[in-house]
Structures are given as structure tokens and as C-alpha cells.
């Protein structure tokens, strides 16, 4: 209620102020400075008509502009025909020149086959040759000769002494032949010794491998039985008794025991 009363009183005051000031601002502006002098009619007419027009163009000049510039001299018919036909054609290329361009440049000379054949093939390395001490065949042959000549070499001097009177002429020849064969067999045996040492199927290689695998058993066997043979026999006995077992509890065969291929 109080707010509405304040609003009504404010509106009433505004209405009273408007009634009291009604017509006073308009009269104040109308009573201000006097207006400037009015524009005379002549000036108004001058601005409306614009600048005075220039002198009129005489009729002769008007006709001259309408007709344009005087035409030039007419082109003679010969010149007209020349432009219609265009420029005279150029001289034709002779047939010989046309054929030369169509054929193009002469082909380059081909490389003779002799130059192609001059390329040498790549060098081929010679095959590797085995030395006498690396030849497995020589070592086997030397081993066979040594084994075959062993008893004869042992019994050769004794037999020669016993049968000296009987075969006097044949004994020196036999001794000479025996010495030659012994020398050859010794040379071949010394040459094939590395190959025999590298072979894994020999008795000595098996004994060495057995010593490497089970040094304790071989040490005991060597003391009791004397040598590597006792150790090898000791190992075989242990295998037979079932001491040596595989990875999965199975018995090891001879190859697995000696070479370590059981697992």
C-alpha cells in the first residue's frame, strides 16, 4: 500500500510539472535569435536555372560532328583482293628435305659382338686341396698297412736269423723291402695321426670322453686297475648295474653314455 501511494504521488507531480511548463519551451525557442535574411528570388532562380548556357553550336559544326571525320581514300579493288587472299604462301619444302626429316637421324653404330665378348668371366677360386696329413683315406690306408705289417715286422729279424743259411740271397731283399714298407708306413701313420686322434669312434677317444664325463669313477678305476682301461670297465659296470640313468629315468645306451647323447 505504501509503495503504491508513493508511485501515485510521483505520477501526480509529473503531471503538474507538465501542465505548468506547457507552451513555455516553444515560446522560448521562438523568441530566440531572429532568423537570417531570406534568400532573394533572383538567387533562387539563378540556382534553379544554373549557369548561363554557352553560345549555341552552329549548325555547320553540328552537321560536321554528326557526319564524322571525312572518309579516307577508298581502298582500290586490287588491295582488297590481296587482303582477302592473305599473304602469299611460302615456298614448299622440297621432297628430299621432307624425306630426310621423316627418316630422322641415322642410327648409331651398334656395339660389335667382339667388344661384348671381351668381358672376362668372374675368377673362379680353385678347389681346396687336402694335405696328406688331413686325408682320411691316407690315414686309413696307413693304419691298415701298419696293422698288416705289424707281425711281419716283429718276426722279420728272427726269421731272417733262423733261415739265414737256407735263403741267403733272399734275406737282404726281404729286409730291404721290409725297411721300405716300414718307412712308408711310419710316414703315413705320422701323417694320419691327427685324423685318428680326431675320430670319435676309436677306443682312445671313447676313453677320453668317459674320463671327461665321470672323472671320479676313472680316478678310482685308475688306482685300482691301473690306467684308463680300468676306468672304462668301471663305467661299463656301473651302466650295467643301472647307476647311469637318462633324463627321464631310462637307462642310457652305449652311445649316450660315451658321447653324452642320452638326453
Curated annotation (Swiss-Prot):
- Region Angiotensin-converting enzyme active site binding: start and end of each range? 89-95, 107-113
* Primary location recorded for the protein, binned into one broad class: secreted
**Basic and acidic residues: bias regions:** 194-204
Residue ranges under compositional bias (Low complexity)? 181-192
Output the Gene Ontology terms for molecular function: hormone activity; peptidase inhibitor activity; toxin activity
Question: Which residues does UniProt assign to the signal peptide?
Answer: 1-23
Q: What's in the GO CC field?
A: extracellular region
Where are the disulfide bridges?
A: 247-263
Its localization reads: Secreted
Residues bearing PTM Pyrrolidone carboxylic acid: 31, 49, 67, 85, 103, 117, 131
Q: Which GO terms describe its biological process?
A: cGMP biosynthetic process; receptor guanylyl cyclase signaling pathway; regulation of blood pressure; vasodilation
Keywords noted in UniProt: Cleavage on pair of basic residues, Disulfide bond, Hypotensive agent, Metalloenzyme inhibitor, Metalloprotease inhibitor, Protease inhibitor, Pyrrolidone carboxylic acid, Repeat, Secreted, Signal, Toxin, Vasoactive, Vasodilator
The protein's name in its UniProt record? Bradykinin-potentiating and C-type natriuretic peptides
Q: What is the lineage of its organism?
A: Eukaryota, Metazoa, Chordata, Craniata, Vertebrata
Amino acid at each position: 500500500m505504501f509503495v503504491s501511494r508513493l508511485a501515485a504521488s510521483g505520477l501526480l507531480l509529473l503531471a503538474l510539472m507538465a501542465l505548468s511548463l506547457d507552451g513555455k519551451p516553444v515560446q522560448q525557442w521562438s523568441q530566440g535569435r531572429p532568423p537570417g535574411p531570406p534568400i532573394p528570388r533572383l538567387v533562387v532562380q539563378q540556382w534553379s536555372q544554373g549557369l548561363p548556357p554557352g553560345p549555341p553550336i552552329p549548325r555547320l559544326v553540328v552537321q560536321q560532328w554528326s557526319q564524322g571525320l571525312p572518309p579516307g581514300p577508298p581502298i582500290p579493288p586490287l588491295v582488297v583482293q590481296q587482303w582477302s587472299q592473305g599473304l602469299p604462301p611460302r615456298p614448299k619444302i622440297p621432297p628430299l628435305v621432307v624425306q630426310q626429316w621423316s627418316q630422322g637421324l641415322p642410327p648409331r653404330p651398334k656395339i660389335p659382338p667382339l667388344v661384348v665378348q671381351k668381358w672376362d668371366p668372374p675368377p673362379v677360386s680353385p678347389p681346396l686341396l687336402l694335405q696328406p696329413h688331413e686325408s682320411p683315406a691316407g690315414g686309413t690306408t696307413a693304419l691298415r698297412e701298419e696293422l698288416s705289417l705289424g707281425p711281419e715286422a716283429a718276426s722279420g729279424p728272427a726269421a731272417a736269423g733262423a733261415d739265414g743259411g737256407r735263403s741267403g740271397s733272399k734275406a737282404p731283399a726281404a729286409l730291404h723291402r721290409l725297411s721300405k714298407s716300414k718307412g712308408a708306413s711310419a710316414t703315413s701313420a705320422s701323417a694320419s695321426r691327427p685324423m685318428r686322434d680326431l675320430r670319435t669312434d676309436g677306443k682312445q677317444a671313447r676313453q677320453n670322453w668317459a674320463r671327461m664325463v665321470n672323472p671320479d669313477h676313472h680316478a678310482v678305476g685308475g688306482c685300482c686297475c691301473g690306467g684308463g682301461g680300468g676306468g672304462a670297465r668301471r663305467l661299463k659296470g656301473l651302466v650295467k648295474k643301472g647307476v647311469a640313468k637318462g633324463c627321464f629315468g631310462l637307462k642310457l645306451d652305449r652311445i649316450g653314455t660315451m658321447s653324452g647323447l642320452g638326453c
